[in-house]
From Swiss-Prot:
Annotated localization: Cytoplasm
Pfam families membership: Leu_Phe_trans
Enzymatic reactions: N-terminal L-lysyl-[protein] + L-leucyl-tRNA(Leu) = N-terminal L-leucyl-L-lysyl-[protein] + tRNA(Leu) + H(+); N-terminal L-arginyl-[protein] + L-leucyl-tRNA(Leu) = N-terminal L-leucyl-L-arginyl-[protein] + tRNA(Leu) + H(+); L-phenylalanyl-tRNA(Phe) + an N-terminal L-alpha-aminoacyl-[protein] = an N-terminal L-phenylalanyl-L-alpha-aminoacyl-[protein] + tRNA(Phe)
Source organism superkingdom: Bacteria
Keywords attached to this entry: Acyltransferase, Cytoplasm, Transferase
Protein name: Leucyl/phenylalanyl-tRNA--protein transferase
Purpose of the protein: Functions in the N-end rule pathway of protein degradation where it conjugates Leu, Phe and, less efficiently, Met from aminoacyl-tRNAs to the N-termini of proteins containing an N-terminal arginine or lysine.
Keyword Hydrolase on entry: no
Cellular component GO terms held in the UniProt record: cytoplasm
PANTHER family found in the cross-reference section: LEUCYL/PHENYLALANYL-TRNA--PROTEIN TRANSFERASE, LEUCYL_PHENYLALANYL-TRNA--PROTEIN TRANSFERASE
Record bears the keyword Membrane: no
Length: 226
């Protein structure tokens, strides 16, 4: 049975209570306050829903993640990066990145990044939890991604690309940055061919929860000014 959250409690049900079909649906309802969102990521779930639906909270099993030391950069991508087509920055324009991620895609109907989601994550950015990667070509924003950093874990949310390899260049820069700062895992949530090509793989929900328990409260050396 699906658990419905109330606005007066930040408690989520145990992850093992998530439904098998649809895979990982853990709870519904609640709100998108910064406190609830932080509690959700610390618990191992994330919001994902369409306009017109209640807020839905997910903890899929298996979970797609990338360990920084397993980043795979193809020869062609490595050559492209060396050619220096793009300039990469962190946290220089979070609102523009999430707006671009929310824009309609040719291959999808609508977007799951609603206006309320954008406002909520911009507030998390102001509070120092959410961070962005900007990829520019001659000053124009052509790619990027955003997510949350907690302890030594990074929770990826969405990425976009308006030019060849732009999101891949941004992702590689993020992984290298996180690796240097001592991060141990990047949560990619759901599988995609794009992420698998960069080294992401599936782990069990139990293994993911173990990483949360061990690394959420460990300090990292990440600096988000670049």
């Amino acid at each position: 049975m699906l658990t419905w959250l109330t606005r007066d409690s930040l408690t989520f049900p145990p992850l093992e209570k998530a439904l098998h079909d649809p895979n990982g649906l853990l709870a519904a309802g609640g709100d998108l306050t910064p406190e609830r969102l932080v509690a959700a990521y610390r618990h191992g779930c994330f919001p994902w829903y369409q306009d017109g639906q209640p807020i839905l909270w997910w903890s899929p099993d298996p979970r797609t993640v990338l360990f920084p030391e397993e980043l795979h950069i193809s020869r062609s991508l490595a050559k492209f990066i060396r050619q220096g087509h793009y300039q990469v920055s962190f946290d220089s324009d979070f609102p523009a990145v999430i707006e671009a991620c929310a824009a309609p895609r040719d291959y999808a109907d609508g977007t799951w990044i609603t206006d309320s989601m954008r406002a909520a994550y911009c507030e998390l950015h102001r509070r120092g939890f959410a961070h962005s990667v900007e990829v520019r070509r001659e000053g124009e924003l052509v790619g990027g991604l955003y997510g949350l950093a907690m302890g030594r874990l990074f929770f990826g949310e969405s990425m976009f690309s308006r030019a060849d390899n732009a999101s891949k260049v941004g992702f590689v820069a993020l992984v290298e940055h996180l690796k240097q700062a001592g991060f141990v895992l990047i949560d990619c949530q759901m599988p995609t061919n794009h992420l698998h090509s960069l080294g992401a793989r599936a782990i069990s929900r139990a293994e993911f929860a173990d990483h949360l328990a061990r690394h959420l409260d460990q300090p990292s050396g990440a600096s988000w000014v670049r």
